[in-house]
Amino acid sequence: MSITKDQILEAVAAMSVMDVVELVSAMEEKFGVSAAAAVAVAAGPAEVAEEKTEFDVVLKGIGANKVAVIKAVRGATGLGLKEAKDLVESAPAVLKEGVSKDDAEALKKSLEEAGAEVEVK
């Protein structure tokens, strides 16, 4: 009678950490492989899955209430009236770069309430 994978997993789960280390060493010797290579390969794709920490807020469109959007942009960016108006009229335009997710979402919400179309990248 052969042992199933489930039985092997249950046996390994019941072992102490030292027993598992000894088992891995014995398997490395028996099969001529290294467990470190498998760990390095498995760790590679995990870096790609990192969560983004900095976001850009992009004004995609003005909407119907241009004045309210200009006021919201002025409040968020600290620009003067002329600069904020030029920025709004040049949509699509990046309003803020490298901001946190919370700040980006708050800015997006305030601009959307003013009638703008906003994207967080």
Swiss-Prot record:
It comes from the Bacteria. GO terms for cellular component: cytosolic large ribosomal subunit. GO terms for molecular function: mRNA binding; structural constituent of ribosome. One of its GO terms (biological process) is translation. Keywords: Ribonucleoprotein, Ribosomal protein. Homodimer. Part of the ribosomal stalk of the 50S ribosomal subunit. Forms a multimeric L10(L12)X complex, where L10 forms an elongated spine to which 2 to 4 L12 dimers bind in a sequential fashion. Binds GTP-bound translation factors. Forms part of the ribosomal stalk which helps the ribosome interact with GTP-bound translation factors. Is thus essential for accurate translation. This is Large ribosomal subunit protein bL12. The gene is rplL.
